[in-house]
Swiss-Prot record:
This is Serine hydroxymethyltransferase. It is found in: Cytoplasm. The gene is glyA. Belongs to the SHMT family. GO terms for cellular component: cytoplasm. It comes from Methanosarcina acetivorans (strain ATCC 35395 / DSM 2834 / JCM 12185 / C2A). InterPro entries: PyrdxlP-dep_Trfase, PyrdxlP-dep_Trfase_major, PyrdxlP-dep_Trfase_small, Ser_HO-MeTrfase, Ser_HO-MeTrfase-like, Ser_HO-MeTrfase_PLP_BS, SHMT-like_dom. Homodimer. Its cofactor is pyridoxal 5'-phosphate. It catalyses: (6R)-5,10-methylene-5,6,7,8-tetrahydrofolate + glycine + H2O = (6S)-5,6,7,8-tetrahydrofolate + L-serine. The record marks H225 as: Plays an important role in substrate specificity. Keywords: Amino-acid biosynthesis, Cytoplasm, One-carbon metabolism, Pyridoxal phosphate, Transferase.
Length: 412
């Protein structure tokens, strides 16, 4: 940091303040986590200096001997932790990974059946404001109004009616186990490709805490941060060599030029960390923590979408609390708790306002927090949301949150 402090004091100050925020605020954003010092060291390494268009052994630049080693390590480790045969670690993001999969087997105008964003899907699965919604004919599916969970019989019926070229499963705000085998059966019934986007649950999957889509899906995409605790980036797993060849061409030269070799090096480090028993224990604890936090909030009268959680996140419908997601997010922020407003199934408000909040336990679990801390956190959330206009009380909660965080440092 001394180099930045000397060259760019303004940026140094911003980084220091962000470091303080991360250490002393309670992060409940389900898509965020803390990369290890080893991952950050790799990402900040001299690998950033190297251009390496192409793939290992077939580059368009000389001098790629050692970045080839880095990419080969990332690929081999990804294959091992996911039990996969064909892996591309070059995508810069999860959305880019999805784009490459679409481009590899679909034509503009083809039909994609995917989860509606307001029911827990993702922008890149076909939202009208995303490239995916503009290029393809999107048939959205949602959760059952009765159970607020997926109804696979209804999905089969929809697929038979719309006959999609591709079915996308996976979500950014769905708290229940996804049955990838049933999705495979639905895809086979209508002759569709199956893409499983496991960006949120990848860490749970490699640890055996959530079923894996790899045996069932034609394509599996993921980010490498979130529950995987790696650098920000994407990855694609393909079921067959033929599909993998199409994906490789779609990634480069299709949508990207040079890969980010420093990020790929960091991905390799993260995948090695994911092989460790401590990582697996943390993933199991992440789910335990989510279940406890969820149960505590239910006891306090909060309406939990689908009645609970099977993974790392939960959706809280705040309509019975007479507060919007936007206002709840702001109140929690004043109390030192960082979360995000979120639409709930059958939402009636704007996505800028929302009726709910999404809460996740990956980041606080990485800090070492367990069930006992989840009970405290539920108390803090209740106080913040039920006293949104009481700045003095929110300040008191913030002090308690800061004390809690100080007992579980991110980078000790």
């Amino acid at each position: 940091m001394s180099y930045i402090e000397k060259i760019d004091p303004d940026m140094f100050e911003a980084i220091q303040k962000e470091a303080d925020r991360q250490e002393h605020k309670l992060n409940l954003i389900a898509s965020e986590n803390y990369a290890s010092r080893a991952v950050m060291e790799a990402q900040g390494s001299i690998m950033t200096n190297k251009y390496a268009e192409g793939y290992s052994g077939k580059r368009y630049y000389g001098g790629c001997d050692f970045v080839d080693i880095a990419e080969n390590l990332a690929i081999a480790r990804a294959k091992e932790i996911f039990g996969a045969k064909y892996v591309n670690v070059q995508p810069h993001s999860g959305s880019g990974a999805n784009m490459a999969v679409y481009f590899s087997v679909l034509q503009p105008g083809d039909t994609i059946m995917s989860m509606d964003l307001s029911h827990g899907g993702h922008l890149s699965h076909g939202s009208p404001v995303s490239f995916s919604g503009k290029l393809y004919n999107i048939v959205p599916y949602g959760v059952s109004k009765e159970t607020e969970a997926l109804d696979y019989d209804e999905l089969m019926k929809m697929a038979k009616e719309c006959k999609p070229k591709m079915i996308v499963c996976g979500a950014s705000a769905y708290p229940r186990v996804i049955d990838f085998k049933k999705f495979r059966e639905i895809a086979d019934e209508v002759g569709a490709y199956l893409l499983a986007d496991i960006a949120h649950i990848a860490g749970l999957v490699v640890s055996g805490v959530h079923p894996s889509p790899v045996p069932y899906a034609d394509f599996v995409t993921t980010t490498t941060h979130k529950t995987l605790r790696g650098p920000r980036g994407g990855m694609i797993i393909s079921k067959t060599e033929e599909l993998a060849m199409g994906v490789n061409k779609a990634v480069f030269p299709g949508i990207q030029g040079g890969p980010l070799m420093h990020v790929i090096a960091a991905k390799a480090v993260a995948f090695k960390e994911a092989m460790d028993e401590k990582f697996r224990q943390d993933q199991a604890q992440t789910v335990k923590n989510a279940k406890v936090l969820c149960a505590c909030l239910k006891e306090k009268g909060f309406d939990i979408v689908s009645g609970g959680t099977d993974n790392h996140l939960m959706l809280v419908n705040l309509n019975n609390m007479n507060i919007t997601g936007k206002d709840a997010e702001a109140a929690m922020s004043k109390a030192g708790i960082i979360a995000n407003k979120n639409t709930v199934p059958f939402e009636t408000r704007s996505p800028f306002i929302t009726s709910g909040v999404r809460l996740g336990t990956p980041a606080c679990t990485t800090r070492g927090m367990k069930e006992k801390e989840m009970e405290l956190i539920a108390d803090y959330i209740e106080t913040a949301i039920k006293n949104a206009g009481n700045d003095a009380l929110l300040s008191e909660v913030s002090a308690k949150v800061r004390d809690l965080c100080s007992r579980f440092p991110v980078y000790s």
